[in-house]
A protein has these predicted regions:
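N-terminal signal peptide c-region/cleavage motif recognized by signal peptidases
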Residues: 15-18
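Bacterial N-terminal signal peptides that target proteins for export
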Residues: 1-9
């Protein structure tokens, strides 16, 4: 095959939808980061979700990039998930004004969750990005958060020293409970 035809085939392949999608794109590089720690949230004998924290170095540093990935073991409505999020923010001492503003901002971050669905929040530089992966499908960007206060508050649910689930936090940070 001559060089011109090879070049044409390569150009056509690159132009095809879906080509080079996945962990090779810079926005999805977090998938290849090593795990810092992992934890499972249970209620009684029911598993609610499994979570993992990832970072480029495999160690957590608050100001460095990191990704929180949650795999749900149960169906959860978007309203119930938002209520749980707001309840955790209330526990952490955020004001009603902040919680209402953030709830509005997160309106499109996720929909109803089904067993096996995954959500990820990737924090880097001055922003955060929400991703959703319905069971058996590819990751999709659902929301970019430019509000650093919101990005920090969302992660505080799991990573704050004042979290409602300190053992869960320690496990995510790779610490021994």
């Amino acid at each position: 095959m001559n060089r011109r035809i090879k070049h044409l085939i390569l150009m056509l392949a690159l132009a095809m939808p879906g080509y080079a999608v996945g962990t090779t794109t810079s926005s999805m590089i977090w998938q290849s980061w090593p795990q810092v720690g992992e934890a499972t949230l249970t209620w009684g004998w029911w598993t609610i979700y499994q979570s993992s924290l990832r970072s480029p170095t495999g160690r957590y540093q608050a100001q460095a990039p990191h990704a929180l990935v949650i795999t749900y073991a149960r169906d959860i409505s978007d309203q119930r998930l938002m209520k749980a999020t707001k309840d955790q923010w209330e526990h952490l001492g955020f004001t009603e004004t902040q919680r209402a503003r953030w709830e509005k901002a997160l309106d499109k971050a996720w929909g109803d969750i089904e067993e096996g669905d995954r959500l990820a929040f990737v924090r880097h530089a001055q922003k955060g990005i929400f991703y959703a992966q319905p069971k058996g499908e590819s990751w999709q960007t659902t929301l970019t958060v430019d509000d650093t206060e919101l990005a920090d508050a969302f992660l505080a649910i799991w990573l704050s020293e004042d979290t409602d689930y300190p053992d869960h936090r320690r496990a995510l940070l790779g610490e021994t409970p």
